[in-house]
From Swiss-Prot:
It comes from the Archaea. It comes from Sulfolobus acidocaldarius (strain ATCC 33909 / DSM 639 / JCM 8929 / NBRC 15157 / NCIMB 11770). This is Elongation factor 1-beta. Gene3D superfamilies: 3.30.70.60. Promotes the exchange of GDP for GTP in EF-1-alpha/GDP, thus allowing the regeneration of EF-1-alpha/GTP that could then be used to form the ternary complex EF-1-alpha/GTP/AAtRNA. The gene is ef1b. Keywords: Elongation factor, Protein biosynthesis. InterPro entries: eEF-1beta-like_sf, EF1B_bsu/dsu_GNE, Transl_elong_EF1B/ribsomal_bS6, Transl_elong_EF1B_B_arc. SUPFAM superfamilies: eEF-1beta-like. One of its GO terms (molecular function) is translation elongation factor activity. The keyword Protein biosynthesis applies.
Length: 90
């Protein structure tokens, strides 16, 4: 069974292209993970966060920590945090 992780990604500056950032996240996702969709959310002073909806296996060792570490390691990312996790399917 899979879960849907909603991840809020804060860029280092307002000059970071969020579309390119989303593509970089998509490229780096491990096997079994999938970027379902993304959107932007205004934060302050013209800065926007990327909201990434990522499907991943529920029984992943380390849970969402591995995903946060992966995204936090991408150039241009200030930090990323899990906003919500929900189980997919019944």
């Amino acid at each position: 069974m899979d879960v849907l992780v909603i991840l809020k990604v804060f860029p280092e500056s307002d000059e970071i292209n969020l579309t390119q950032l989303s593509e970089e996240i998509k490229k780096r996702l491990p096997e079994g993970y999938r970027l379902v969709k993304n959107e932007t959310e205004p934060i302050a002073y013209g800065l926007k966060a990327l909201i990434a909806y990522i499907q991943m296996p529920e029984n992943t060792e380390g849970g969402t920590d591995k995903l946060e570490e992966l995204v936090n390691g991408i150039e241009g990312v200030s930090h990323a945090e899990v906003v919500n996790v929900t189980r997919l399917g019944f």
